[in-house]
UniProtKB/Swiss-Prot annotation:
Protein name: Cyclin-dependent kinase 11
Reactions mediated catalytically: L-seryl-[protein] + ATP = O-phospho-L-seryl-[protein] + ADP + H(+); L-threonyl-[protein] + ATP = O-phospho-L-threonyl-[protein] + ADP + H(+)
Entry keyword set: ATP-binding, Kinase, Nucleotide-binding, Serine/threonine-protein kinase, Transferase
Limits of the Protein kinase domain: 52-336
CDD domains found in the cross-reference section: STKc_CDC2L1
GO CC field: nucleus
Originating organism: Dictyostelium discoideum
Length: 358
């Protein structure tokens, strides 16, 4: 990939009024319209992508391509995420506006930080410059030979819950937590990334999109087609991640939504009026011919973990979202206070970068 030559007179972004209007035609929610309007002033002084030297492509996903790049002025290495615009006729995709808004507002050690918005040659070329992090947890677990030690697992889950608790305290649901969206620095710090599906929520709860969260990490209430859901959907994903870090295998690998739900029932048992009263009111519940399977078989998959570790895992993977533990309560669980204690992040293992240079 050729390097972009640095312009002697550093370019700045100068969005014209009619371009702003074009962007704002997007069918945003009122709060998001207001937020994007507030970005017009910062955009007028944002830097050009010419200020960065693209080194290699990290990955390409549904919402954009991510490059490893170097700031030509400071020589700092950053992750440069180009927002996909191919199908957008009326401005920036709503998912990208939400991601920018959320990342600008959330400031936490366990959440990836956005540094600035960067523009290309025209309004349809927009980048987010974010802190560069060496690994994603999924890729790392695929290449390391040894599993994480119990103290290291405890540190990773504690950091994950710290980030999730902070998100939920600030009225944000991530809606796509999985090991591939967790980054791991060479200083032993875990960071939550990829906020393309994140949404702010409020009280009372309002209907939200159902088609969220990668299938293997999707909570049962979402699989049963509910539109009214809570941050508990993120907690289910945390439970799946916890199990995956322990075993280095994805816990529930369904081939479809029906198969995923079937695997959940086989592992955790079928719900009853007592264990999950609202289950029978969910849109797709009536289509399941439930065989009576009252037993939770999760312990059989993790026979060697401590009782406290299993208890926390079980509370994170509670079928009934109303009974599922919160992130803040999970951080107070005895699991984090028994031996071995969580390992200091500075003593966590490190590895060469797992990003493939393409």
């Amino acid at each position: 990939m050729s390097n972009i030559q640095e312009n002697e007179n550093k370019e700045t972004c100068n969005i014209k009024e009619n371009e702003n209007k074009e962007i704002l035609k997007e069918n945003f929610k009122n709060k998001e319209k207001q937020y994007f309007s507030s970005l017009r002033s910062p955009y007028s002084a944002c830097r050009s992508v010419d200020c960065f030297k693209k080194l290699y492509t990290i990955n390409e996903g549904a919402f954009g391509v991510v490059y490893c790049a170097q700031d030509k002025e400071t020589e700092e290495i950053v992750a440069l995420k180009k927002i996909k615009m191919e199908r957008e006729r009326e401005g920036i995709p709503i998912t990208s506006v939400r991601e920018i808004k959320v990342l600008m507002e959330l400031k936490h050690d366990n959440i990836v930080q956005i540094k600035e918005i960067v523009l290309g040659k025209n309004i349809n070329s927009i980048f987010m410059a974010m802190e560069f992090i060496d690994h994603d947890l999924r890729g790392l677990m695929e290449v390391i030979k040894k599993p994480f030690l119990p103290s290291e697992i405890k540190t990773l889950i504690q950091q994950l819950l710290n980030g999730v608790s902070y998100m939920h305290d600030n009225w944000v649901i991530h809606r796509d937590l999985k090991t591939a969206n967790l980054l791991y620095t060479n200083k032993g710090v875990l960071k939550i990334a990829d906020f393309g599906l994140a949404r702010e929520y409020g009280s009372p709860l309002k209907p939200l999109s159902k088609g969220v969260v990668t299938l293997w990490y999707r909570a049962p209430e979402l699989l049963l087609d509910t539109e009214i859901y809570t941050p508990a959907i993120d907690i289910w994903s945390v439970g799946c991640i916890f199990a995956e870090i322990i075993s280095k295998e994805v816990l529930l690998q369904g081939s479809s939504e029906i198969d995923q739900m079937d695997k959940i029932f086989k592992l955790f048992g079928t719900p009853t009026e007592k264990s999950w009263p609202a289950f029978f009111k969910l849109p797709l519940a009536k289509y399941f011919n439930l065989t009576d399977q009252p037993y939770n078989n999760l312990k059989s998959k993790f026979p060697h973990i401590t009782d406290n570790a299993f208890d926390l895992l079980n509370k994170l993977l509670e079928l009934n979202p109303e009974a599922r533990i919160s992130a803040s309560d999970a951080l107070k669980h005895p699991y984090f206070f028994e031996n071995p204690q969580p390992r200091d992040p500075l003593l966590m293992p490190t590895w060469p970068s797992s990003h493939k240079k393409t």
